[in-house]
């Protein structure tokens, strides 16, 4: 999923910007740190999560028990209140801040997350956002 694909998915969702934010690989793509991601992960407010549950969208508890994780189709997951730091607009799209994204990746601790942290750090050292 490239930047255009992500923007199209978000357009199709048609959610108010205050209800959600892009995290994980999608945020990496929107910041220009990667050209594509396998899927789109979003954070959302409890109010949006309640709307999704009422609409019958499949969900399960998040691993840490802090909220719900919804599955929209084959390539979009929505995590209730999954946010570190703050949300900032990137080309008009609500996206987790780079510092928040870095911390989120550090907490996940997978090899691909360590590679992403290196990309974020290099970008910040070059004076990015």
Predicted segment positions?
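Compositionally biased terminal segments of proteins
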Residues: 1-129
